[in-house]
Amino acid sequence: MIEIKNLHKVFNKKLHVLNGIDYKIEDGEKVVIIGPSGSGKSTFLRCLNLLETPTDGQIFVDGVDITAKKTNIDKVRMGMGMVFQHFNLFPHFTVAKNIWFSPVHHKLMTKEEGKKEAMRLLERVGLADKADAYPSTLSGGQKQRIAIVRALAMKPKVMLLTNRPQPLTPKWSVRFLTL
């Protein structure tokens, strides 16, 4: 599904953060990138969905070079769910609206379909009772589950998380892998 060839990222022409990464990730494969703080893990993920422009190299998704100049970056990003260290839930939206807003806004589903999908996902992560709550009332683990299902609501081919699901209980960490 994803093939990375000779990926480099240099900041300010002198800080070489990514240095010739070659890697292939197959469909359904789960990959964890481990390293000390500042070692380029988040930069690597940001390059994969083109939030950072690689300095050199190529990234192929399903055989398509997404680093090519003609690439529709928005289309690439819609196929990759990304959950950041800070979950960035919309504070003025309910939990359910945080989930259904983007798929409806991008016309992937109707508002009615989006609301049904939000409830289905909330049920899968044990938070259906929080649908009408606001993010400020949630625990860290609950916020992370909402951020994950918000990304899943876009039906991405790939999920990228900049940090492991640490606020999740061991039970939810395992269940996350099957969502």
Where are the model-predicted features located?
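ABC family nucleotide-binding domain
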Residues: I2-E3, H8-L179
